[in-house]
């Protein structure tokens, strides 16, 4: 791959590309240095500048697509983080189901089982809220 890039890129294209990289796009499009150059070296420079202007046009064309991809990735990430809230609901159901089964087996341990159930409920709910917080961070903070 490096050999292909080395053959395809001339030094003038690399210089022109690095010059465009730190300039604003409007300045790169509006100021055409190939108009002021003449002679044998200008053909290579014109080819390099045309390649750079094609890259600039491609940037204008794909910026909307890039934004759409970023938005879709945000929604997918937020949806994946929201799955943790469903896991929290399943965990809470398991905790209180185990409380009922434990109380049915040994009613004398009612107070101790209930305190463990409250602890399990709190931990499961905290994980659900954490997943919901991450989903909102993905949607609105990124």
From Swiss-Prot:
Positions of transmembrane segments: 83-103, 118-138
FT transit peptide: 1-67
Subcellular location: Mitochondrion membrane
CDD domains given in the database record: ATP-synt_Fo_c_ATP5G3
GO cellular component, one term: mitochondrial membrane
Alphabetically ordered keywords of this record: CF(0), Hydrogen ion transport, Ion transport, Lipid-binding, Membrane, Methylation, Mitochondrion, Transit peptide, Transmembrane, Transmembrane helix, Transport
SUPFAM superfamilies: F1F0 ATP synthase subunit C
GO molecular function annotation: lipid binding; proton transmembrane transporter activity
Sites of N6,N6,N6-trimethyllysine modification: 110
Membrane topology: Multi-pass membrane protein
Domain of life, per lineage: Eukaryota
Site for Reversibly protonated during proton transport, residues: 125
Cysteine-cysteine disulfides: none
Modifications after synthesis and translation: Trimethylated by ATPSCKMT at Lys-110. Methylation is required for proper incorporation of the C subunit into the ATP synthase complex and mitochondrial respiration.
GO biological process: proton motive force-driven ATP synthesis
Other facts noted in the record for this chain: There are three genes which encode the mitochondrial ATP synthase proteolipid and they specify precursors with different import sequences but identical mature proteins.
Disease (UniProt): This protein is the major protein stored in the storage bodies of animals or humans affected with ceroid lipofuscinosis (Batten disease).
Record-stated family: Belongs to the ATPase C chain family.
HAMAP family in UniProt: ATP_synth_c_bact
Biological function: Mitochondrial membrane ATP synthase (F(1)F(0) ATP synthase or Complex V) produces ATP from ADP in the presence of a proton gradient across the membrane which is generated by electron transport complexes of the respiratory chain. F-type ATPases consist of two structural domains, F(1) - containing the extramembraneous catalytic core and F(0) - containing the membrane proton channel, linked together by a central stalk and a peripheral stalk. During catalysis, ATP synthesis in the catalytic domain of F(1) is coupled via a rotary mechanism of the central stalk subunits to proton translocation.
Assembly description: F-type ATPases have 2 components, CF(1) - the catalytic core - and CF(0) - the membrane proton channel. CF(1) has five subunits: alpha(3), beta(3), gamma(1), delta(1), epsilon(1). CF(0) has three main subunits: a, b and c. Interacts with TMEM70 and TMEM242.
Name used for this protein in its record: ATP synthase F(0) complex subunit C3, mitochondrial
Organism: Pongo abelii (Sumatran orangutan)
């Amino acid at each position: 791959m490096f050999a292909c890039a080395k053959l395809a890129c001339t030094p003038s294209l690399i210089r022109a590309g690095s010059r465009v990289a730190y300039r604003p796009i409007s300045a790169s499009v509006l100021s055409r240095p190939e108009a002021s150059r003449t002679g044998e070296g200008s053909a290579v420079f014109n080819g390099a500048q045309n390649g750079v202007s094609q890259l600039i046009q491609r940037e204008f064309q794909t910026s909307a697509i890039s934004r759409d991809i970023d938005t879709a990735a945000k929604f997918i990430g937020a949806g994946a983080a929201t799955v943790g809230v469903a896991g929290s609901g399943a965990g809470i159901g398991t905790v209180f189901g185990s409380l009922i089964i434990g109380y049915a087996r040994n009613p004398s341990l009612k107070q101790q089982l209930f305190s463990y159930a409250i602890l399990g409920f709190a931990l499961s709910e905290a994980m659900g809220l954490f997943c919901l917080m991450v989903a909102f961070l993905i949607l609105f903070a990124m």
